[in-house]
């Protein structure tokens, strides 16, 4: 989407050293992606009701932790704010607004709905079994322009970092996750024989899909499939 490279960590592991590394070596804007559920729990409103940003990045109001903070900008204090965002016991009262950390609200469904770094961050921490809060920071080259995938080799080697693309994450999720749930199954007798009708709901957008099945489906035999995008005929 942005065609930029980001450093990403889980928010609960946001040590002062990690935030200082991002500020020193990545040098982009340090943001804190949150799942929509987490953003709602912390009552973080969007920064603007009319998002005109090129990529529709969903910035919420900026925050600082409400306790043990002076100005909020140091690596240590930003790391405290970020870890508090990930703390499942934290509430809206544990933050002040505005602040020096920029939460980003991910869309439901993650990278399968929006192929952005916000969603990639949340998908990765969820896959790791961690709290749905992360940290991301764009990587800038020495000349101040944004690093692309072809620029990352020396950076990765120097600091011992692993890399993946949003496209790889999308491919992995499509291969490993079930994207629908069975809602109901009914028998459907017709003039052309007895069918079974299955109703499925998409986890991504709530869309409903019908599958009409005639006969027995066997895993060791090919099955004839016809797809209708609008109506059943």
Show which residues each predicted segment covers.
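Catalytic domains of riboflavin
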Residues: 1-233
């Amino acid at each position: 989407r942005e065609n930029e490279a980001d450093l990403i960590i889980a928010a609960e592991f946001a040590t002062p050293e990690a935030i200082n590394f991002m500020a020193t070596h990545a040098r982009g804007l340090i943001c804190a992606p949150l799942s929509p559920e987490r953003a709602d729990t912390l009552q973080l409103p969007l920064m603007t009701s009319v998002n005109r940003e090129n990529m529709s990045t969903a910035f919420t109001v900026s925050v600082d932790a409400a306790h043990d903070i002076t100005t909020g900008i140091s690596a240590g204090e930003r790391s405290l704010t970020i870890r508090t965002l990930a703390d499942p016991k934290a509430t809206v009262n544990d933050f002040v607004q505005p602040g020096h950390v920029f939460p980003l609200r991910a869309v439901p469904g993650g990278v399968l709905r929006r192929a952005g770094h916000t969603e990639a961050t949340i998908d990765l921490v969820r896959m790791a079994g961690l709290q749905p809060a992360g940290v991301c920071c764009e990587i800038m080259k020495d000349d101040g322009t944004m690093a692309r995938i072809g620029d990352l080799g020396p950076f990765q080697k120097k600091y011992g970092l692993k890399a993946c693309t949003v496209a790889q994450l999308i491919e992995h999720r499509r291969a490993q996750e079930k994207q629908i749930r069975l809602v109901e199954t009914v028998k459907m007798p017709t003039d052309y024989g007895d069918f079974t009708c299955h109703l499925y709901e998409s986890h991504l957008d709530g869309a409903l899909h019908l599958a009409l099945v005639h006969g027995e489906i066997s895993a060791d035999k090919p099955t004839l499939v016809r797809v209708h995008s609008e109506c059943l005929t």
